Regions:
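Extended, charge-enriched "interface" segments that sit outside catalytic cores
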Residues: 1-71
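Glycine-rich phosphate-binding loops that contact phosphosugars or nucleotide phosphates
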Residues: 65, 69-163
Length: 163
């Protein structure tokens, strides 16, 4: 259980207000743990890595091997919001702080698209794609997010023209 010391906040947060929020937080936690609330079909992450299907591990290894054989040195992660931030946080949390500097020739550079539709950013991404062997990963819960869809179409068009 997480414990929070709000002693310094007592002049700003009334005791009754705090207790009401604690009740709401505990209720939300119970719904999450029971996996019966809205969005319950999107809770597969709760069981990782202990319940990762071997077929998923194999599929990831196959993609890795395929990309290595094609000398992929640029991976474009396309997503927005939690889709983009989840990937970015996982990469940063699991990587050496200076991974790019230490392993620049062994590990593909990871860049992001869809979170920023500035025309300059997209143009610069295409410049980068023109001098690198690129692959992309699209992350979208709904598949209908405008920014993700636009970025994917642009990246896909360039990849099709290149390969």
């Amino acid at each position: 259980m997480v414990k929070v010391n709000i002693g310094g906040c007592s002049s700003f947060v009334k005791d009754a207000e705090y207790k009401a929020y604690v009740e709401k937080a505990l209720s939300a936690f119970d719904v999450l743990e029971s996996e019966k609330g809205a969005g319950n079909d999107f809770l597969g992450w709760k069981h990782l890595p202990s319940e990762t299907p071997e077929s998923l591990v194999k599929a990831c290894e196959d993609i890795r091997d395929d990309w290595k054989s094609k000398n992929i040195d640029l991976v474009i992660v396309i997503g927005i919001g939690g889709s983009y931030l989840g990937a970015k946080c996982a990469i940063e949390a699991l990587s050496h702080s200076f991974a790019k500097e230490l392993h620049s020739k062994d590990v593909p550079q990871v860049v992001f698209a869809g979170n920023n539709l500035s025309e300059e950013y997209i143009s610069e991404l295409i410049d980068l794609m023109q001098v690198r062997n690129a692959a992309c990963v699209v992350i979208s819960k709904s598949g209908t997010t405008t920014e993700t869809a636009v970025a994917f179409r642009i990246v896909k068009q360039h990849l099709e023209e290149t390969y």
